[in-house]
Design a protein with these regions (language model features):
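Basic, Lys/Arg- and aromatic-enriched nucleic-acid-binding interface segment
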Residues: 1-32, 133
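A short acidic (Asp/Glu
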Residues: 35-36, 140-141, 161-165
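Short, basic (Lys/Arg/His-rich) helix/loop patches that form interaction surfaces
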Residues: 8-12, 104-152, 156-160
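Short, flexible loop/turn elements at secondary-structure junctions
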Residues: 26-29, 42, 57, 144, ...
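The alpha-helix within a helix-turn-helix
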Residues: 25, 36-39, 150-151
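Active-site/catalytic core of tyrosine-dependent DNA strand-transfer enzymes
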Residues: 67-126, 135
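Conserved tyrosine-mediated DNA breakage-rejoining catalytic core shared by Y-recombinases
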Residues: 1-8, 28, 37-82
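Catalytic-site neighborhood detector that most strongly recognizes the C-terminal catalytic loop/helix
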Residues: 153-181
Length: 181
């Protein structure tokens, strides 16, 4: 299902500002209205996420807390407790997104709804602007659930299992699969 959705978005993103916006929403795990496309500051940064839509810096960065023990020892030795990945975006995405500034907000909303309805025809669930940004993270969490379940069924101890490294590598793997298709 996710591969089907990503394929549609990737195929159309080169030529359609709306598809570029939806694709960027999925890739950056951010609702499209919260992307810096519609703001004066073209960079948004929070504790775990950074989105930049500047001409020389078009990327998003996501980080995950990897330590279950945020104690003094880790801080004292400055051990890396965060795993992160950065995905640069092609320049034409930025050019497409800048075209959206010429459009009215109501027009953008209606076009997004129109495109989501077209995508929904091939789905077994309702794709919305709210669940679209969670698409990749939900896939990763589902796969993580299967991995944990298989470890438990195999009788392995999962008390000290830390999924952090899994997230960053798996999401990149998933994106690579989408790009290749």
């Amino acid at each position: 299902t996710a591969q089907y959705i990503m394929q549609i978005l990737l195929e159309q993103a080169e030529n359609s500002p709306i598809h570029t916006l939806l694709l960027f929403s999925v890739l950056s795990l951010t609702h499209y209205k919260d992307l810096p496309v519609f703001q004066k500051n073209l960079r948004v940064s929070t504790k775990n996420k950074e989105v930049s839509l500047q001409p020389q810096k078009c990327f998003f960065k996501q980080s995950f807390e990897v330590s279950k023990f945020k104690d003094f020892v880790l801080r004292k030795h400055r051990l890396n407790t965060v795993n992160s990945f950065t995905i640069p975006l092609p320049q034409y995405y930025l050019e497409n997104l800048s075209q959206l500034k010429k459009m009215d907000g109501v027009e953008i909303d209606s076009k997004i709804q129109e495109y989501l309805q077209k995508i929904n025809k091939g789905l077994t669930f309702q794709l919305t602007t709210q669940n679209l940004p969670r698409l990749i993270s939900d896939i990763a969490l589902n796969e993580l659930g299967y991995e944990l379940e298989s470890k438990l069924l195999a009788g392995e101890n999962v008390n000290n299992y830390t999924p952090c490294h899994y997230f960053s590598t798996k999401i990149i793997d998933i994106l690579d699969i989408y790009i290749q298709t």
